[in-house]
């Protein structure tokens, strides 16, 4: 249950923070603490129901990526929902505000991962909750824009209600929601996919339409299964993330992944520094294929396969130790360059030398260096380019 507090202890300010489903949100002070307060005006029965639903759901939720409720108050005419105050604003404001801060793919994946964790949690409750309004406006940032929390549960519902009413923000709604079919967790997955596309394009969904502000045009595009333009996605977005977007936005709900699957995939992408498999032609007869894997023990490894026309292929495998990832990348460059000079014999020797270097690295501790993990990919690309100039089999 949400704690009932005395309204006299709540000092509302004039600062307007935004408007959620069913009420305005203002800044306030409660027990010498800055908070956000959602104000519900019960002139309409629908608003009253939304308020009770939001308060009920938030009272059952305890997750680091969901806004925390402090209590509720009433003055007889209106109800007030007291929540933690996150002063850095919404993800929408970050994307489209006046400051226009730049952000990396890694940061976008971090935001998406945190949202996925929260949704996976909501969908896995004993009474699973569907948020029904996933969008950047409902993602609040904190910790110098590094982290986010989902807010505004006014439209949320537990899946046992079998809701068929059209609720949410049109640009982010699933086709089945528009067609008044049953709301399921896969509706949140679709909205998540739309938001992920938005993170990787910094464009409003359906802004490519001839009449992008027409509700009818947007509704028609969604219900017909029209895809958002993938060519608008930033060039450094990993292919795996693009494929995830398309899976989430599949017109068939059954083909969309679960939020738990999405959380797992994004977690692997983020921990690996969004390393991408790639292919590098070295000459007319030789191609280098660099791939990243997780072995049976959960450790990350990098494989470099040299495929040669009418000759046996050669494989080099490198464990990736987090703390020493940067040094490993340099070792890969050095040892592969040696291999390029002498052929197969040196390739095998290089592999042994690199394994020795990695073994030493493993003894130096497990301190996390995410940036170093990215350097492995960059150094590997450089190594392959050097081999393109020097390799002779």
Curated annotation (Swiss-Prot):
It catalyses: L-seryl-[protein] + ATP = O-phospho-L-seryl-[protein] + ADP + H(+); L-threonyl-[protein] + ATP = O-phospho-L-threonyl-[protein] + ADP + H(+). Residues 339-379 are annotated as: Disordered. The keyword Kinase applies. CDD domains: STKc_TAK1. The keyword Transferase applies. Its cofactor is Mg(2+). GO terms for biological process: immune response; JNK cascade; positive regulation of canonical NF-kappaB signal transduction; response to stress. SUPFAM superfamilies: Protein kinase-like (PK-like). Keywords: ATP-binding, Kinase, Magnesium, Metal-binding, Nucleotide-binding, Serine/threonine-protein kinase, Transferase, Tyrosine-protein kinase. InterPro entries: Kinase-like_dom_sf, Prot_kinase_dom, Protein_kinase_ATP_BS, Ser-Thr/Tyr_kinase_cat_dom, Ser/Thr_kinase_AS. This is Putative mitogen-activated protein kinase kinase kinase 7-like.
């Amino acid at each position: 249950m949400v704690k009932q507090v005395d309204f006299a202890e709540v000092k509302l300010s004039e600062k307007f923070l935004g408007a959620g489903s069913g009420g305005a949100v203002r800044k306030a002070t409660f027990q010498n603490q800055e908070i956000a307060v959602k104000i519900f005006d019960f002139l309409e029965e629908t608003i009253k129901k939304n308020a009770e639903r939001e308060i009920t759901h938030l009272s059952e939720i305890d997750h680091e990526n969901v806004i925390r409720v402090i209590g509720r108050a009433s003055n007889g005419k209106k109800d007030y929902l007291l929540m933690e105050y996150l002063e850095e604003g919404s993800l929408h404001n970050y994307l489209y505000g006046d400051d226009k801060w730049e952000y990396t793919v890694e940061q976008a994946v971090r935001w998406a991962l945190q949202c996925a964790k929260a949704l996976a949690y909501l969908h896995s409750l004993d009474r699973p909750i569907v948020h029904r309004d996933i969008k950047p406006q409902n993602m609040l940032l904190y910790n110098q824009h590094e982290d986010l929390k989902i807010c505004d549960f006014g439209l949320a519902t537990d899946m046992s209600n079998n809701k068929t009413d059209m609720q949410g923000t049109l640009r982010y709604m699933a086709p089945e929601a528009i067609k008044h079919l049953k709301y399921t967790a896969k509706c949140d997955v679709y909205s998540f996919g739309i938001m992920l596309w938005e993170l990787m394009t910094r464009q409003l969904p359906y802004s490519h339409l001839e009449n992008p502000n027409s509700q009818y045009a947007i509704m028609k595009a969604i219900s017909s299964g029209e895809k958002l333009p993938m060519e608008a996605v930033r060039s450094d977005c990993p292919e795996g993330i693009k494929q995830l977007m398309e899976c989430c936005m599949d017109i068939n709900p059954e083909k969309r992944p679960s939020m738990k699957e999405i959380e797992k995939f994004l977690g692997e992408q983020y921990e690996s520094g969004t390393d991408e498999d790639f292919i590098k032609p070295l000459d007319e007869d030789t191609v280098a294929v660099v791939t990243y894997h997780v072995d049976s023990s959960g450790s990350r490894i990098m494989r470099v396969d040299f495929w040669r026309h009418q000759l046996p292929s050669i494989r080099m495998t490198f464990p990736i130790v987090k703390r020493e990832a940067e040094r490993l990348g340099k070792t890969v460059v050095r040892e592969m360059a040696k291999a390029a000079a002498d052929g197969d014999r040196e390739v095998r020797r290089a592999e042994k030398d690199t394994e020795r270097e990695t073994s030493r690295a493993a003894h130096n501790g497990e301190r996390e260096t995410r940036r170093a993990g990215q350097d492995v990919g960059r150094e590997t690309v450089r190594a392959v380019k050097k081999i393109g100039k020097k390799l002779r089999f």
